[in-house]
Amino acid sequence: MKITFLGHAAVLVEGKKNLIIDPFITGNPACPVKLEDLPKIDYILVTHGHGDHLGDAVEIAKKNDAIVISNYEICQYLGKKGVKTHAMHIGGSYLFDFGRVKMTPAVHGSGILDGENIIYGGNPGGFLITLEGKKIYHAGDTGLTKDMELLKEENVDVAFLPIGGNFVMDVEDAIRAVSMISPRKVVPMHYGTWEIIFADVELFKKKVEEMGVECVILEPGESLEL
């Protein structure tokens, strides 16, 4: 299984089925690819309704006849745009043809900006994805929460955690999150896209590895194999 970081919080998972999480491609200053560069996508996972996460979900879904997995409200919004969806909510899990997805809590917002209006986008979340014998945790946008302690029991293989501060956890809180989750690997995300979310990623790596957890800093476009 190949996992590619596409910048900000966008992650491409290529295996027996191809998944993309938070597909912010167009307009993402950190993303090294264009929509036409993506492989065929089978499923799109959207953690919440903000534009830098909902991103190109509609265009990718229609081009690939892909299914969007998100919360109920976002799925209702996308369904009206002709997109195939599978609605979930926090704490719910479902076995798909590629593996199991569980929606986890996140502390953030989820409003969808539509012209001059903000549409209610339900509750933000993260995803615990079990596929091909591995577990991937994508936290979405979130502050530090004690709920993360429950993930320690899941034996997460790789955790994608936001570290950029201001809107999400900063480096210090993300380090605390790692101690709660105890993943085998952690990949920092949601930092450096814009100046307001600058983070000292090398400090994060140093502190995480002092805890005995491997920290993999992926530049946009780089991949790891699971």
UniProtKB/Swiss-Prot annotation:
Pfam families: Lactamase_B_2 (PF12706). InterPro entries: Metallo-B-lactamas (IPR001279), RibonucZ/Hydroxyglut_hydro (IPR036866), UPF0173 (IPR022877), UPF0173_UPF0282_UlaG_hydrolase (IPR050114). SMART domains: Lactamase_B. GO terms for molecular function: hydrolase activity. This is UPF0173 metal-dependent hydrolase CTN_1413. Keywords: Hydrolase. PANTHER family: UPF0173 METAL-DEPENDENT HYDROLASE MJ1163, UPF0173 METAL-DEPENDENT HYDROLASE MJ1163-RELATED.
